[in-house]
């Protein structure tokens, strides 16, 4: 009788138990122009809008919109360098890539799912809309202190800027803690990476 008291019952994760603020590891299933469709455990789907990827990406998108408004007035100017424009989601992510996310909202199902049907067409998209997630490192890494960071620690980071021998990263931990990744590989400013200290 006493052994049963020491046991902890682990519940399967489902849409009803998924609460805002829950941190979850996701796998990218589809990449759309304005959102990522991700798979979570227990065959649940969610979506990450382009504005919930990182603050830096959102800032670059807003600047591009503002620039487009100005360019409409001045058509004769030369095209900007491709690197100056915001990256598109397929440039940053790939299907099958693992990402960390935090639940922003969960909506109840609008219509009953018809059993026997696969996740084809609109149903797949509709089901992914039930859970809205964010990848912003300041939200996903919430609760992590600078003291917690030690060798081997895994966390999300945003590519802030290109440096001479790599890229500076915003870890979203605190204003005075930043990262650096030495690489010759080309990364896009605003991209979110899963990095290890």
Please report, for each region that a protein language model flagged, where it lies by residue:
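Single-stranded RNA-binding regions, centering on S1/OB-family and related RNA-binding modules
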Residues: 1-197
